[in-house]
UniProtKB/Swiss-Prot annotation:
Functional note: Involved in the restart of stalled replication forks, which reloads the replicative helicase on sites other than the origin of replication; the PriA-PriB pathway is the major replication restart pathway. During primosome assembly it facilitates complex formation between PriA and DnaT on DNA; stabilizes PriA on DNA. Stimulates the DNA unwinding activity of PriA helicase.
GO biological process, one term: DNA replication, synthesis of primer
InterPro entries per the UniProt record, alphabetical: NA-bd_OB-fold, Primosome_PriB/ssb, Prisomal_replication_PriB
Organism of derivation: Salmonella typhi
Entry superkingdom: Bacteria
Protein name (database record): Replication restart protein PriB
GO molecular function, one term: single-stranded DNA binding
UniProt keyword list: DNA replication, DNA-binding, Primosome
Length: 104
């Protein structure tokens, strides 16, 4: 089964870093996406806020460059996580992160 997602946007919630009891580093943040997409010949506004988690040592270095307002592209897979309130939420598990040059 295929499960791949590429999403570009702006980091809208500060990264939160934790280390699991087994020593695996995790970085969590929220990515906000806004764009205009074409569907059935019409333009529509697309918007979402997607929680992102970066796990393992491989991608942790780039997470130290990520702050609120950073523009990035994230590639990975999606999965549901059960929140503390018991509700499920979709989470993007990042496997590749690219900083988008702001052109400044």
């Amino acid at each position: 089964m295929t499960n791949r997602l590429t999403l570009s946007g702006t980091v809208c919630r500060a990264p939160l870093r934790k280390v699991s009891p087994s020593g695996i580093p995790h970085c969590q943040f929220v990515l906000e996406h806004r764009s205009v997409q074409e569907e059935a010949g019409f333009h529509r506004q697309a918007w979402c806020q997607m929680p992102v988690i970066v796990s393992g040592h491989e991608n942790q270095a780039i997470t130290h460059s990520i702050t609120v307002g950073s523009r990035i592209t994230v590639q990975g897979f999606i999965s549901c996580h059960k929140a503390k309130n018991g509700l499920s939420k979709m989470v993007l598990h990042a496997e590749q992160i690219e900083l988008i040059d702001s052109g400044d």
